[in-house]
Amino acid sequence: MDQNKLKQEAAQRAAEFVEDGMTIGLGTGSTVVYLVEAIAQRIKDEHLNLTGVATSVRTRKQAESLGIPMKALDEVGQIDLTIDGADEVDKHFQGIKGGGRSHLIEKIVAINSARNIWIVDETKLVDTLGKFPLPLEVIPFGSGKLLQRLADEGLKPAYRLNEDGSKALTDSKNYIIDLHLGKIEHPHLLAEWLNKQVGIVEHGLFLDLVKTVVVGTTHGPEILDAHRG
């Protein structure tokens, strides 16, 4: 089955977790595009009263264009549910996010949410994190020195570039440095070290935030729940 079809089916299944009256966080990425469409359709069909909080400019624009009422994070209380994609998810429900350059805002929204659900296709499930490059959102000033420090630690860093060779910018006008690690044996220790490095605004390790993952498979969407083991 086409990978986009798997994403679409998983997104449609995840949209079923949305309930009337909720404030919902809307993630960023190719899978979330289908999610926003599915939620907008539910609002139209079921007359749901929802408020959305977007994690990126492009998600907000899509949601508003489809009639989903949107507010900024500081304009709402706690978010009831945030649904987002992920670039990798391991068997312990830890993940890497940031392929879409939005992991800083995604993490801020996630930690302010009562519940987080990820939607992925089955290719994103891994035994060990790290094959997907780990993104770091970094302050532009002094980023070259930071890049060298990361290289000295053996973390194989590289600026993320646009097609024209310019440095890719986040919505917050920061740079992205990707770490090409191959395998992350101890994600919590790595996260702790990265948190101490001056110049790194946020890393793409999302640890201990999610208990439910909706997976698009060739046999239909499957729900993985950490509480069920």
Curated annotation (Swiss-Prot):
The major lineage groups are: Bacteria, Bacillati, Bacillota, Bacilli, Lactobacillales
Question: What's the protein called, per UniProt?
Answer: Ribose-5-phosphate isomerase A
Q: Name one GO cellular component term.
A: cytosol
What is the documented function of this protein?
Catalyzes the reversible conversion of ribose-5-phosphate to ribulose 5-phosphate.
Q: Which organism is it from?
A: Lacticaseibacillus paracasei (strain ATCC 334 / BCRC 17002 / CCUG 31169 / CIP 107868 / KCTC 3260 / NRRL B-441) (Lactobacillus paracasei)
Q: What is its EC number?
A: 5.3.1.6
Residues bound to substrate? T28, G29, S30, T31, D84, G85, A86, D87, K97, G98, G99, G100, K124
Regarding protein family, the annotation reads:
Belongs to the ribose 5-phosphate isomerase family.
One Gene Ontology term of the molecular function aspect: ribose-5-phosphate isomerase activity
Q: Which UniProt keywords apply?
A: Isomerase
Per the record's keyword annotation, is Mitochondrion included, yes or no?
Answer: no
Give any Pfam family that matches: Rib_5-P_isom_A
Instruction: Check the record and name the PANTHER family matching this protein.
Output: RIBOSE-5-PHOSPHATE ISOMERASE
Disulphide bond pairs: none
InterPro entries cross-referenced by the UniProt entry? NagB/RpiA_transferase-like, Ribose5P_isomerase_typA_subgr, Ribose5P_isomerase_type_A
Keyword Isomerase set for record:
yes
Pathway info? Carbohydrate degradation; pentose phosphate pathway; D-ribose 5-phosphate from D-ribulose 5-phosphate (non-oxidative stage): step 1/1
Q: How does it assemble?
A: Homodimer.
SUPFAM superfamilies referenced in this protein's UniProt entry, alphabetically: D-ribose-5-phosphate isomerase (RpiA), lid domain, NagB/RpiA/CoA transferase-like
Catalytic residue list: E106 (proton acceptor)
Record's catalysed reaction(s): aldehydo-D-ribose 5-phosphate = D-ribulose 5-phosphate
